[in-house]
């Protein structure tokens, strides 16, 4: 019987920092998992090396569910982003191994395709309305059928949502970049630039917007009402999700769909939002929510309550996680949309992925397993670089949700 023989943890920064787990069995089969937690990469790497790896040696790689339960329940201390990201890496690697052993792509192990492709959206941004419109046009010309639109708020020095190079990466400094925030200016400006997008390009594509937890429930309700004419696919994270009952107030005042869950990492975090139908899309992602095994549970719960999936997929997901996400997306019946930003050229030097983009959709690899390879030698050219996400401050200097 095959057993887990070795487990390795790699930390490298090819374009951005990724933590990659590689499990090798006694039969010589390898599986990859993503353990990247933006700004806390070394914490997860240490948790894996010091606490998880010793538990895996000698285990049966095919006992995926048992291993998940062992790592979750056996640790006593449960949930949290570090723990769930570490478990996700192991779980994803074991699914990769199972697919390779069976000679099947992971989506076939999950029940096969429910659709021909995975609808994705990417990020259009600008320092002002004209540059935003140019970027929306660029994405539509690339074939995207769904675009998220963000523009810098006039008079505010912060640049959240604004492209900073080939691939927008907010975690770009060794210490947090402190950015000012003006809620009233945002509430005045954002509806107008979303309206400008619709006036220029019409309604023949999906338009999304990320509020990024920055509004109170009342402000979020006001914003949702103000953008109804633009027919958003969703407004994302309109208010901090810790106060889950607040979404009931938002629901009562606007028909703009709501997407929540990017910063959540377990089914218990989103259970109330789903069962009370306070959201339309759940944005938990494979790397931060316990891997394919646990994310499938979240999606199944969501399906019972007519909530669709819309997983996080920014550049803090390595190509390993993106491949796992696409395999799951194409299989589940209640798929909605998948975020997809692409990666830097340096990332492609380290990760080879079989995921392809065409006509606004991603398509999973038909290779056995996830269809991703990791080039350890190439990764050595990109040593770890510490990077933090920004911090927002109101104009009075107090810390605000970024």
Curated annotation (Swiss-Prot):
Which Pfam families does the annotation name?
A: MR_MLE_C, MR_MLE_N
Protein's GO biological process: amino acid catabolic process; carbohydrate catabolic process
Q: Which GO terms describe its molecular function?
A: magnesium ion binding; mannonate dehydratase activity
Family the entry assigns: Belongs to the mandelate racemase/muconate lactonizing enzyme family.
Q: What is this protein called?
A: Uncharacterized protein ORF2 in unstable DNA locus
- Per the UniProt record, the source organism is Streptomyces ambofaciens
């Amino acid at each position: 019987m095959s057993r887990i023989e070795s487990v390795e943890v790699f930390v490298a920064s090819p374009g951005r920092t990724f933590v990659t787990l590689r499990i090798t069995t006694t039969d010589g089969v390898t599986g990859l998992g993503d353990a990247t937690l933006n700004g806390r990469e070394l914490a997860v790497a240490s948790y894996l090396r010091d606490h998880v790896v010793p538990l895996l040696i000698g285990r049966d790689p095919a006992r995926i569910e048992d291993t998940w339960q062992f790592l979750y329940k056996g640790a006593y201390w449960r949930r949290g982003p570090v723990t769930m990201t570490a478990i996700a890496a192991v779980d994803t690697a074991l699914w990769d191994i199972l697919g390779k052993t069976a000679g099947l792509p992971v989506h076939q192990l999950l029940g096969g395709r429910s659709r021909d492709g995975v609808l994705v959206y990417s990020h259009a941004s600008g320092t002002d309305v004209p540059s935003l419109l140019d970027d929306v046009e660029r994405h539509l010309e690339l074939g995207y059928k769904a675009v998220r639109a963000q523009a810098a708020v006039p008079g505010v020095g912060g640049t959240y949502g604004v492209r900073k190079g080939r691939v927008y990466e907010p975690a770009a400094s060794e210490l947090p970049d402190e950015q000012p925030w003006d809620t009233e200016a945002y509430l005045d400006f954002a509806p107008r630039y979303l309206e400008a997008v619709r006036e220029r390009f019409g309604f023949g594509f999906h338009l999304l917007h990320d509020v990024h937890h920055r509004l109170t429930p009342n402000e979020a309700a006001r914003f949702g009402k103000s953008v109804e004419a633009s027919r958003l696919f969703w407004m994302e994270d309109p208010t901090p999700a810790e106060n889950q009952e607040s979404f009931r107030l938002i629901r009562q005042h606007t028909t703009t769909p709501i997407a929540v869950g990017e910063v959540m990492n377990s089914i218990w975090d989103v259970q109330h939002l789903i069962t009370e139908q306070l959201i339309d899309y759940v944005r938990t992602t494979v790397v931060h929510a316990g891997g394919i095994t646990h994310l499938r549970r979240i999606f199944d719960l969501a399906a019972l309550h007519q909530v669709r999936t819309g997983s996080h997929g920014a550049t803090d997901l390595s190509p390993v996680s993106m491949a796992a996400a696409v395999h799951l997306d194409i299989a589940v019946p209640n798929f909605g949309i998948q975020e997809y930003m692409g990666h830097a050229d340096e990332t492609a030097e380290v990760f080879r992925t079989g995921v392809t983009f065409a006509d606004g959709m991603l398509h999973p690899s038909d290779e056995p397993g996830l269809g991703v390879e990791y080039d350890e030698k190439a990764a050595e050219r990109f040593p770890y670089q510490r990077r933090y996400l920004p911090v927002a401050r109101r104009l009075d200097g107090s810390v605000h949700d970024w």
